[in-house]
Amino acid sequence: MVHLRSIVAFIASVATVISPAAADGQGSFLWDPPYDNEANVYARVIELQHAGSSNGNLLATWEHWYANTTENAAYPNGTEGSFIIRESEDGGETWNTLTTIFDTQTGPGHPCARFWQPFFFEFPHQLGEYPEGTLLLVGNLVPSNKSFTEFFTWRSSDHGHTWDPVGAWQEGGTTRAGIWEPFLYLDRDGSLVAAFSDERNATAHSQMLVQVVSNDGGDTWGDVIPTVASDIQTDRPGMPTVTLMDNGEYLMAYEVCGRDPLNCPVYVKTSPDGITWEENDLGIAVVSEDGRYLGSSPYTLWDPSTKQLLLAAHNTWDSMTNAKTAEAQRSVYINKNYGVGNWSWAPSPWAVSYASSACNSNYSPHMLLRSNGTIRYTSPTSQGSSRYCAVRTGQAPIGVLPYVADFAANGQLGWINTGAAGKVAWSVSDDQYNFGKVGGSISALAITGSTGWTDYKISADAQIVGSNGTVGIVARVSQPKPGLDQFYGYTLAIESSTGNLTLYRNTDNAVGLVSMGFSGGIEPDIWYSISLAVEGSQLTAVLRSEYSDSNLTLTVHDENYSRGIAGLIGKVGRGSFRNVFIE
């Protein structure tokens, strides 16, 4: 049984229009569920690249089933599940449903109620008897009683419009004896590899990562080969994703559950050929320079245009306290050394809502590298305060310089608010980025860029709105937390109460480094151009008014912070920004 929310909502969901100027920073609907008991998570999106006139089109699908809301919402209500296939022909601005795939098998447990863990793969060249452009869709079919887990494949020869069942190719048992999360890629020799999680040898390994190889385009598969198998029986490496880097190495990212800390920290390791993984090597935990670590359901990709690894996951945690961080569920990790050494982080293109406990927001987020160099981020997100997940999507560059903010076109995509913990609203009107009233124990802090940035200049037009206020820009920010001045880094602020331009060092409080009055003072409702350049230990601040040719320049040396993210800040009153540029 499905619970219809409204006929209008269903009609609207058939062709979802995505506004590029969405000002709430929450992404835009890929799927607005018409039924209030729909479970929608684990979305996957692909851009067709071997499809002739269909090149550039996007295809998307996700886990789709119906929860038993009257007895146990974690279980299906008996209605068969499906994979809904949606297509966008305009880069993700609008989506239409192409078809819906059901379980056509018969026998005990079929048709399956759970359609879990889908994955698309487009053939870049002929594999077996199947030509370039052939599509595979694999998923994990699980019945209501979880009596088995089954990887099943469908094939499309018309770029996703129709799908033929290929069949089951791996069989697992019940929960704690099952198979999970298939991921397809090509190894160095061009063979098709499926990586997945395996509990079928639970007496030795509660869960391990394994792979199978196909040399005929997915018709048949070879033996199961372990790729990550811990010596500790209770360790549970899981949810593998793999990407090929431009040094020829393959990098695998995965969670490791079952050990302290209990947040399933993300690990990575590399292979020279995509097939040799040294199974007893558990890999390296992903930790940022400012002491954060990723936890649960990772997804990784290599961005050749910026030569950096990107890694998203369900959550981020403080490595000292194991508490969620201010940027939790809305950050992407970056590594510029092929997975070795330090990681930095950047805001995800948009921020999920976790208002509803019935939705596991940001679980297994998906990233797609677009042909235009931006990253499309797709994730489950709360739909209201009590309902299950919708699926939203949005795209933005991640950690790329130079950066020009186009608020009129992109809204808040690529920005997150960490200072006020949801107590202060940021909004977009035309080309302006605005924050509501702040003061007391909170500040409005919106950040963009990467904590790995070192030498750069941020400039913006800033305006105090109303009678009194303090607004400014920040640089080299790390470890942000909710509250007033709760971060490490530098702040450049204009203050109407003093008429000063002040440069601060922040160490979870603000310490003035240099301050000077501006000719004519700082007036509300007037635009001021401010910039802060950080180069080595030298900090250079510049201020000018839209009604004056006079400039005020402050220069100081400070060696406390060498890298960090950039952003905008409001400490008192209300404010607006425009013409934000980082170079």
Predicted regions: what they are:
Residues 1-24:
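Fungal secretory targeting signals
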Residues 23-401:
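Asp-box/BNR beta-propeller blade signature and adjacent active/binding-site loops
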Residues 24, 395-421:
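Extracellular carbohydrate-recognition regions
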Residues 407, 460, 523-555:
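Carbohydrate-binding surfaces in secreted/extracellular proteins
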Residues 410-443:
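Extracellular glycan-recognition surfaces and repeat-rich motifs
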Residues 437-502:
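Secretory/extracellular carbohydrate-interaction modules
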Residues 507-529:
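Short, aromatic/His-centered strand-loop micro-motif at the edge of beta-sheets
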Residues 552-579:
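Flexible glycan-contacting loops in extracellular carbohydrate-active proteins
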